[in-house]
């Protein structure tokens, strides 16, 4: 069913924008005739969706006005850099490098447990890190990864610097990864997972006939929160970018939340798109 909906979405996205305008005008008139909740109330309900789409902790491509090219999320960049650096470290010292990652993270966290618990947590953290990095990076790491050799201070520091992206990624935990460091007593969902859950829960509580408007409000809120690039030149309308943003928002929320949203989701504000300052020519 999910593949079928995405296929229909892709088919409708390839049609001309004028075709969307027809459904937009009809949808807007129908929307005005209905007893709909207030704009502010809808936007407040969809705040988690705004937060999730802005964080982009999943590989979403949201071409809002300032986004001229596809951008990776910060977590994706951290993951890529982590795997890239880990691949460059010789196999015989990868265990040592991973130990350094564990040490670096534990040193940044408050030491509230006794030494025995810290050692137990460190061993468990090490095992989880091995499994995570092996699955995430698809790079060989010995199964029985033990710190077998002593390295000089300069080599220690160099290894730690190389795997800084790994520490950053694991601390962000934007993927469903749970590394039980000392202060973490139970497996906890990531911040992105929490926001995603809240987003889907709120979207499911909105009546079907109002979901299009709610998603449009999300796209508008994100656009208004983002800085507008101003260069010297002429004003140009940003209707294509706005419609593409809404289309991508629809696709992302359909896939993520598995909630019914009309395939032909009308854009009630399509005929009242403000002229956004986009300059062409001249110096910025």
Swiss-Prot record:
Organism in which the protein naturally occurs: Triticum aestivum
Function: Seed storage protein. Might be integrated via inter-chain disulfide bonds within the glutenin polymer.
Name of the protein this chain belongs to: Avenin-like b11
Transport found in the keyword field: no
Organism domain of life: Eukaryota
UniProt similarity note: Belongs to the prolamin family.
UniProt xrefs under InterPro entries: Bifun_inhib/LTP/seed_sf (IPR036312), Bifunc_inhib/LTP/seed_store (IPR016140), Glia_glutenin (IPR001954)
Pfam families for this protein: Gliadin
Endpoints of the signal sequence: 1-18
Keywords: Disulfide bond, Seed storage protein, Signal, Storage protein
Modification(s) after translation: Contains disulfide bonds.
SMART domains with a match to the protein in the record: AAI
GO molecular function: nutrient reservoir activity
């Amino acid at each position: 069913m999910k593949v079928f909906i995405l296929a229909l979405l892709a088919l409708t996205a390839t049609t001309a924008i004028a075709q969307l305008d027809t459904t937009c005008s009809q949808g807007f008139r129908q929307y005005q005739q209905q007893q709909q909740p207030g704009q502010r109330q809808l936007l407040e309900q969809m705040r988690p969706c705004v937060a999730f789409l802005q964080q982009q902790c999943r590989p979403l491509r949201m071409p809002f006005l300032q986004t001229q090219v596809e951008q990776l999320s910060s977590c994706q960049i951290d993951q890529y850099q982590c795997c890239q650096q880990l691949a460059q470290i010789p196999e015989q010292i990868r265990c040592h490098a991973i130990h350094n990652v564990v040490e670096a993270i534990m040193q940044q966290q408050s030491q509230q447990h006794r030494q025995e618990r810290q050692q137990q947590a460190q061993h468990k953290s090490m095992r989880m890190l091995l499994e995570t990095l092996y699955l995430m990076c698809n790079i060989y790491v010995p199964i029985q990864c033990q710190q077998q050799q002593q390295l000089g201070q300069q080599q220690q520091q160099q290894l730690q610097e190389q795997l800084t992206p790994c520490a950053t990624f694991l601390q962000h935990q934007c993927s469903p990864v749970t590394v039980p460091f000392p202060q973490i007593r139970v497996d906890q969902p990531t911040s992105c997972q929490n926001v995603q859950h809240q987003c889907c829960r709120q979207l499911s509580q909105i009546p079907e006939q109002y979901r299009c408007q709610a998603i449009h409000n999300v796209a508008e809120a994100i656009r208004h929160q983002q800085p507008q690039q101003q260069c010297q030149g002429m004003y140009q309308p940003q209707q294509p970018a706005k419609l593409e943003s809404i289309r991508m928002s629809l696709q992302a929320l359909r896939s993520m939340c598995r909630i019914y949203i009309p395939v032909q989701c009308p854009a009630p504000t399509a005929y009242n798109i403000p002229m956004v300052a986009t300059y062409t020519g001249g110096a910025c």
